[in-house]
């Protein structure tokens, strides 16, 4: 866009508003980008302490905007269509932030802010969110906002990771890419109720709890040995809070091939995850009401076998 406008003699200016710190504002001492989250977050926090949070009282300057009488383009004019899916209301109450660490991993509990879609479309200010998090003294919530900016600077400095593994040796993995199994994963009929609940929630609402995102992503890549790019593409189609940097970064994290990723031998047990995060089956019951009935799908793969197969394939590719 900048190149096009400048070629027409039109001045193009950008103003930082989507993030606290842009792609090259938080770097190592030698100016190179961070590839590991923890040192990046420390530098990010130090920069925040130094620079503080600038407030922009835009409403005080509304009288300076140009008056014109042209009809504004509607959403339909821009190619959008109405949908029955409703954007979730975000919650940034002091109570939620203070209890975030204790509640965030339980999908049946209203323990997350659901801010993603609002940050994506700019209907909430990142400065306001950071200020709110700091006022409660809860660094766990704040660090999740830092992860977002970490992944954004990674995608800027390493644009090839949009479609390629950050760790190139992982391109040697021989994915099975079974289309029937992928379809069952997409539809939430894998026979693993926690996985199925997440996919059905995604398909129905355009949202999925973060803990469940990690599980369904790991299940696709590790249990079914389906290329992470298939899952990333499906999430890009369905998620209302889709941001390329976070989506790519998190998919490569669960697949083990990304920057600062989980080790490849970390393979979630879908049944154990229920015991830890949905013991009373409240979340599962909401999205997979038939999970205890004979009509429920048989498991698409046996966990022990899938785990051993995954480890063998990964080891073979990385040796």
Q: Which ranges hold each PLM region?
A:
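Active-site neighborhoods of enzyme catalytic cores
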Residues: 1-41
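Generic detector of short, locally flexible boundary/turn motifs and exposed helical patches
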Residues: 2-4, 83-84, 92-95, 182, ...
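Glycine/tryptophan-enriched, flexible segments
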Residues: 10, 31-170, 273-319
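Low-complexity, flexible helical/coil segments
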Residues: 19-26, 48-55, 73, 180-182, ...
């Amino acid at each position: 866009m900048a190149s096009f406008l400048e070629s027409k003699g039109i001045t193009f200016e950008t103003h930082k508003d989507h993030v606290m710190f842009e792609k090259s504002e938080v770097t190592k001492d030698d100016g190179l980008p961070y590839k590991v989250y923890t040192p990046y977050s420390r530098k990010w926090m130090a920069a925040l302490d130094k620079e503080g949070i600038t407030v922009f009282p835009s409403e005080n300057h509304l009288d300076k905007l140009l008056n014109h009488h042209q009809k504004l383009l509607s959403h339909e004019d821009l190619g959008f269509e109405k949908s029955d899916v409703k954007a979730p209301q975000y919650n940034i109450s002091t109570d939620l932030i203070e209890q975030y660490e204790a509640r965030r991993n339980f999908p049946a509990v209203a323990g997350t802010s659901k801010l993603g879609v609002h940050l994506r479309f700019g209907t909430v200010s990142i400065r306001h969110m950071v200020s709110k998090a700091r006022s409660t003294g809860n660094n766990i919530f704040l660090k999740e906002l830092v992860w977002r900016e970490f992944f954004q600077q990674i995608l800027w400095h390493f644009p090839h990771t949009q479609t390629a593994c950050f760790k190139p040796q992982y391109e040697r993995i021989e994915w099975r890419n079974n289309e029937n199994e992928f379809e069952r994963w997409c539809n939430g009929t894998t026979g693993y109720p926690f996985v199925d609940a997440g996919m059905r929630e995604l398909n129905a609402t355009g949202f999925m709890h973060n803990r469940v995102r990690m599980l369904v992503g790991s299940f696709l890549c590790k249990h079914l040995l389906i290329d992470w790019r298939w899952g990333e593409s499906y999430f890009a189609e369905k998620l209302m809070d889709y941001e390329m940097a976070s989506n790519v970064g998190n998919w490569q994290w669960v697949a083990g091939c990304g920057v600062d990723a989980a080790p490849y031998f970390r393979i979630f047990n879908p049944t154990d995850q229920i015991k830890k995060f949905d013991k009373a089956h409240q979340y599962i019951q909401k999205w997979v009401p038939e999970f205890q009935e004979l009509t429920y799908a048989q498991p698409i793969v046996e966990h022990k076998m899938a785990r051993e197969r995954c480890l063998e394939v990964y080891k073979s590719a990385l040796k």
